[in-house]
C-alpha cells in the first residue's frame, strides 16, 4: 500500500499545508517588498515623513508615532490605527486590482490581515516566515552599521552633568580630596537613581503600557521576581493537619513559566537599559498567549489586563510549586493521595507564590442571624478591590423604581383593552354614523367577546373538573344530608397556592319579587334550603362551602336542591391549584306562582357563572324561551351558546367532594428535598460576642467622608447590610432548633429555616500593595456608559476604618493602617474611544516593606509620612514631569497604594 501524503507530518507542516489566512498567497510578494526596502528608514512612516518635510514639523512629533506597519505586497510603510493619520489603514482602503491586506508590524514582527481582521500566525519554514526572517536579519545588520541612537532625555542629562562638572572645576582651581569625593558621590547618585522610561505603543496597547508603568515602579515586585528567577532558597509549605501541622520544604528545580520570565526580563530592561523608550513586545505576546482576547490590537480594559497578568503569573508559580511538592511526597504517599492534597491546597490558596505575597489580601464577610444571634464568617481572597462609584447607586435606584410603575401601567392598559380586543378602533368607525349606533355596535362587540371568552374558559375548566371529580368523588356517598355551615373568620386565608373559593350571597325572594344583594367580597356559596312553599331564603354574608346537587329538569319551574353542605370545609389542595375564581350573584326563589324569569343585566358578569345564566339556561332547556325577558337579543344568544358549558360545569361540581384537611400553618419553613439543597456558601461559625462582631480597627463615625471620594466608595463597599426577603440567611442553628420541635411526620426530608440577618464585609488581611479599581464603566439597561465624575483620592490612605478589629499583620495596639499613593491609571475619553495614561511616583525602594515580604516580620512602629519622590505623567513613549496637584486632579481609574512601614 502507498502511504498518503501528510499523514506523518509534524504540527508545523500542517500549518504550512493549511494556511490560516486564505488571502496569504495573493497578498504576499517577496520581490516587491525587498526592492522597496533598499536604503530607507524602516522605523518611520513614509507618508508622515513626507508630510513633516512639507510642514517643517519638529522631530519630536514624528517620533511619537508608536508603530510602523509594512505592506507585504508593495513594501509601503505606514503608521497604525492608533495614530491620527492611519496611513497603513488608508493604504489598504485604496481600491486596487489586487489586495494589499497583509501587513507586518516592524516593532513586534507580527503579521495582520485586514480582510480577516485577525493576526496571521507563521513559522520559519513557511513563505511568510522566511520573509520575516529576512527582514529581521536586514534590520539587525542595519542597526550594527549605524551609530547607536541616544534618546533626547539622556542627551540632556549628559549635557547637564558635564556642565556641572566643568563649573565645579573652574570654580575651584585647586580642588582638594573632599571635593573629589563629593563629585564622585554625585555622579554615582545620578547613575544609580531609578529612572522613568516610555513604552512603545504596539497598536492600541495604551491599556497595557499604563499598567506596565505602574508595575515597573513597584520595587518589591522586582525583588520578588529576582528571588524567583534564582530560586536559591527552598519554599516552605505548611501542611495543615488536625493533630499536628507539618512544615514541608520544597526545592524548586523547574524554571519559572514563560509569562513570569517575560515579566522579569521586562522589569530588568526598564531598570538597566540606557534607552529612553522600551518595546515590550515579548511580554505582550506572552499575555496574548494566556488570554486570547487581547490579540488583534483592539481597545481593551486596563483592570482586566492586570487581573489576567497577575492570575497568569500566579498560576505558573503554583504549578511549579505543586510539581515540586508531588516529587517530594512520592516516597511517602500514593499518587491519588498526592493529587487530593494538591487540590486541597489549591482550594485553600495555601500554596506560596509571589503574587499573593505582594498583591493578595483577604476579605471577611461577617453574618449574624437576628433570631439566634449566631455569628458566622466567610473568608474571600482578593488581588484588588473593585469599588462602586456613588453615581452608579443613584442610577440603580432610578432604574429599579421605574419599571414597576411601567408594568402596572401596562397591566392596567391590558385590563382596559381586554374587553375591546374584538372592537374596531375609533378611527375605523365611519364619521357619518350616529353616536347611538356606535355605542350599540361597541356593546354588541363587547358582549360577543365576553361570550367567546366565557366559552374558552369553561371549556378548560369543565375538562379539569371532570378529571378531578373522577379522582375525588366516592361511589358510595351519593346523597348527603343538608346541613348549615358556620361562618369563617375574615382573616382566615387559604394556604394552598392559587386557592380561589366560590361564594354567593343569596337574598330572600318572596312571590317572585327578587332583591339582589350587593357587596360580595368572598367567593363561597351560602345556600339555604329551598322548600316548595312561600319560604324566605336565609340571607346575609354567610360564607359556606359548596357542594351543588343536580338541577332537575322536566317541569316549568326550577327546583333547586342543595345537598351535601358540610361544616368548615375547604377545597382539596388538588382543586385549589386549578380552580379559578367564580363570582356569582344568584337570584333563586320560589317559582311555583311565577313562570316568568327575569334576568337583570349587571355591568360586568363573570363568564359562565351567576344565577342569571343558570336560570336562563334552565328556562331554555325546559322550552320556556319566551319566559326569559332581556333587553338585548344578543345576551340571549350568548346564554344559549354557553348553556351546555354551564350544565356540564354544574354536573361536574356536583361530584366534587369537599374536605377540610388544610389548615393555615404559622411555621415559616421551606421544605426542600435532599436533591434540591440550596447552593449556599460554607460559613465558619465562631463563638463571638454579637456586640463586637461588626467592630472595626478604628472608629468609622469620625470619617471625613466626601460625597464623591475613595473614602465614600470604601464606606459603601464595607457598609452593613440587612438580609431580608429573598436574601434571607439559611441558618443552620435555627434549622436544628426547628427540626427538634417538629414531629417526625416528614421523614427523609430536610427542613431549612431562613431568617433575617445582618452582613458586613471588611478587610481582615491587608495586602502590601493595595490596588483600588473605581468602577467607572457601567451598564445601564442595554446601554454602556462611563462615569466621568471626578473622584477624590488621598495621597495617604488610612484603611483601618474598613478593617476588622482582629486584622492580621497589624501590630497590637495599632489603630492606623496607612498606605501611600505611588501610581495612578487615568482613562480619558469615552467608552468607545479613549486613551489610558499613567502617573507614577519616582522614589527609592521601601526597605521595610521588602524586609516584611522576605522575613514576615512586621515593624512595631509604622511610618506616618510618605517617602519623597517626583511624579511623572507617561503617555506611551512620552514622559513629562508633573506636580502632585495634577496627579490628585486626574480622572483615576486604577489606584496603586504601597503600605507605609
UniProtKB/Swiss-Prot annotation:
Biased composition range(s): Basic and acidic residues: 420-429
Protein name per Swiss-Prot or TrEMBL: Ubiquitin carboxyl-terminal hydrolase 16
GO MF assignments: cysteine-type deubiquitinase activity; cysteine-type endopeptidase activity; histone binding; transcription coactivator activity; ubiquitin binding; zinc ion binding
Annotated organism of origin: Xenopus laevis (African clawed frog)
Active site: 206 (nucleophile), 835 (proton acceptor)
Pfam families: UCH, zf-UBP
Residues that, per the record, bind Zn(2+) 3: 71, 74, 91, 100
General function of this protein: Specifically deubiquitinates 'Lys-120' of histone H2A (H2AK119Ub), a specific tag for epigenetic transcriptional repression, thereby acting as a coactivator. Deubiquitination of histone H2A is a prerequisite for subsequent phosphorylation at 'Ser-11' of histone H3 (H3S10ph), and is required for chromosome segregation when cells enter into mitosis. Regulates Hox gene expression via histone H2A deubiquitination. Prefers nucleosomal substrates. Does not deubiquitinate histone H2B.
Similarity comment text for this entry: Belongs to the peptidase C19 family. USP16 subfamily.
Quaternary assembly: Homotetramer.
Gene: usp16
Region entry Disordered, spans: 398-502
Protein residues bound to Zn(2+) 2: 45, 48, 79, 87
GO annotation terms (biological process): anterior/posterior pattern specification; cell division; chromatin organization; mitotic nuclear division; positive regulation of DNA-templated transcription; protein deubiquitination; protein homotetramerization; proteolysis
Keyword Protease on entry: yes
